Amino acid sequence: MKEEQIKQIVEQVIKTFEEAQSVPMEVPVEVSARHIHLSKEHISLLFGSEDQLSIIKELSQPGQFQYDKRVTLIGPKGSIGNVAILGPSRDETQVEISYTDARALGIKPPLRESGDLQDTAGIIIATGHKAINLEGGVMIAKRHIHMTPKDAEVFHVKDGEHVKVRIESKRPIVLEDVLVRVNEKYGLSMHIDHDEGNAAAYQPGTTGKMIK
């Protein structure tokens, strides 16, 4: 191979690398307030049937929505009312709260990825007239980024990878150990809880810059 050809190849590699580095690594950030995903069984026990629930708002993730009804969480130390119910229903009930919520309720839920319910905390879930004792299912959700496979290619990450994200706000902070979740059905968005949002002085429209 001639020296000129080698030079052209090296220049192309450098150009490709620089272009990759120049790709904006920003993602929209959303604060995920305390909420619950109910199983069909628990919807029936609390409300009679799923027909009693109406969708009032579509969420940023395709196919996800909020119902019109709310529940109260009751723990050994206190209770938290007006907790949103998100749909669609799941195979198992899952409750996502913050560390501040956990202290107010008097429980010690683990930090988990959504869907990992083994050895999670219990809680009483109540409506105006009915209540169920959930033996497990309460967690503090790990901060994470939803993205499509195409997004993952652009950001040079893969499903299950952990990254750092600098929250671009009036009170910028760097969040480590942010889980990347990749699926065709997802929409690009980073989810943090209220504790993390308050620490960063979050406001709607806040973005995060991914740090590899």
UniProtKB/Swiss-Prot annotation:
Against InterPro entries, the record matches this protein to: PTAC
Q: Which family does it belong to?
A: Belongs to the PduL family.
Q: What pathway is it annotated to?
A: Polyol metabolism; 1,2-propanediol degradation
Question: At the top level of its lineage, which domain of life is listed?
Answer: Bacteria
Q: Which organism is it from?
A: Alkaliphilus metalliredigens (strain QYMF)
Which amino acid positions bind Zn(2+) 2, per UniProt? H144, H146, H191
Q: Where in the cell is it found?
A: Bacterial microcompartment
Identify the keywords attached in UniProt to this record, alphabetized.
Acyltransferase, Bacterial microcompartment, Metal-binding, Transferase, Zinc
Binding of Zn(2+) 1 occurs at: H35, H37, E96
What GO cellular component entries does it have?
bacterial microcompartment
Give this protein's Gene Ontology molecular function annotations: acyltransferase activity, transferring groups other than amino-acyl groups; metal ion binding
- What does the protein in this record do? Involved in 1,2-propanediol (1,2-PD) utilization within the bacterial microcompartment (BMC) dedicated to 1,2-PD degradation by catalyzing the conversion of propanoyl-CoA to propanoyl-phosphate.
One Pfam family from the UniProt entry? PTAC
Which free-text remark accompanies the cofactor?
Answer: There are 2 Zn(2+) ions per monomer; Zn(2+) and CoA bind inbetween the 2 domains in each monomer.
Question: What's the name of its gene?
Answer: pduL
Question: What domain notes does the record hold?
Answer: Formed by 2 beta-barrels, each is capped on both ends by short alpha-helices.
* Any one Gene Ontology BP term: propanediol catabolic process
Co-factor(s): Zn(2+)
Q: Which amino acids does the record list as binding phosphate?
A: R90
Q: Catalysed reaction per UniProt?
A: propanoyl-CoA + phosphate = propanoyl phosphate + CoA
Name-wise, this protein is Phosphate propanoyltransferase
Q: EC number(s)?
A: 2.3.1.222
